[in-house]
Amino acid sequence: MSVNIDSRVVTSGSDDHVDEAWQLKEAINRQEGVLKQRYDFFTSAYRRSTVYCYLQEDELVGFAAVRRDGYILFLAVSPDCRGQGLGKRLVARVADEHDTITCHARTSNENALQFYEHLGFEIKRRIDNYYEDGGDAYYLKLGSDAGLADRISELVRR
């Protein structure tokens, strides 16, 4: 059975899908103990970002909130939709617009680290006490070469 996934782009300054994104983030937080941002921080950062969204039957199932410089503030895919390539497609969408993509991931978030490393991100440095709760982070980077979009597109096709 084929499932249709619609994509949308929320431009900076918009509230479109912010509540659904918050609810998805919170569901992941409850289940996995990651994505621990406070509501005010999350919504403010969301509104200042370009947000790439995937919806299934009008329900938000994945999103990436990205700054103008290609820094991914938030990347989340519903646990029910993982393994379908949505995360890769979100990163590929970011790669279409940016030569370099960067992000932070908790040192304890093995799922995220495996995902990013599979896509070719490199850990550039560790930052102790990066998060508000004292959690440590890795700063990750992908790209800065002309073939970034092609490499990501190839991964998505796999």
Residue spans of the language-model regions?
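Conserved catalytic-core motifs of GNAT/GCN5-like acyltransferases
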Residues: 104-106, 122-139, 151-152
